Amino acid sequence: MPFSHTKIVGPAGRYGARYGMGLRRKITAIEIKQRGKHRCPSCRSLVRLKRLAFGIWQCPKCGFTFAGGAWVPQTVMGKTLTPEELKEVEIQKARWRETGK
């Protein structure tokens, strides 16, 4: 069987002409982000993290295993807030409560 990945379709080339172009474009976008280099939260090195299971990631350099997103290691919702950012959020909540009453 010939090599199914090409420069144009990327990793979705393994599906051939099946499933439609829209879905294959979405898959390509997800898989390029998923297999790209990400920063390890423990050793801070920029490496290709290994996906062990759905949302479980491991750094090949330090061996640190952590929970992240399903398709990418760090999600926007899972971003850790610094204490200063957390205080700012609490201040904004208090202002909102005062204006709402």
UniProtKB/Swiss-Prot annotation:
Q: How is the cofactor bound?
A: Binds 1 zinc ion per subunit.
**What Pfam families does this protein's entry cite?**
Ribosomal_L37ae (PF01780)
What processes in GO biological process is this protein linked to?
A: translation
Indicate whether Ribonucleoprotein appears among the record's keywords.
Answer: yes
Q: Which cofactor does it need?
A: Zn(2+)
Parts of the chain that traverse the membrane? none
What's the superkingdom here? Archaea
Which one of the record's GO molecular function terms can you name? zinc ion binding
Family annotation (Gene3D superfamilies): 2.20.25.30
Q: Where are the zinc fingers (C4-type)?
A: 40-62
Give me the Gene Ontology terms describing cellular component. Answer: ribonucleoprotein complex; ribosome
Q: Which UniProt keywords apply?
A: Metal-binding, Ribonucleoprotein, Ribosomal protein, RNA-binding, Zinc, Zinc-finger
Give the record's family classification: Belongs to the eukaryotic ribosomal protein eL43 family.
The name under which this protein is listed is Large ribosomal subunit protein eL43
Q: Which organism is it from?
A: Pyrobaculum islandicum (strain DSM 4184 / JCM 9189 / GEO3)
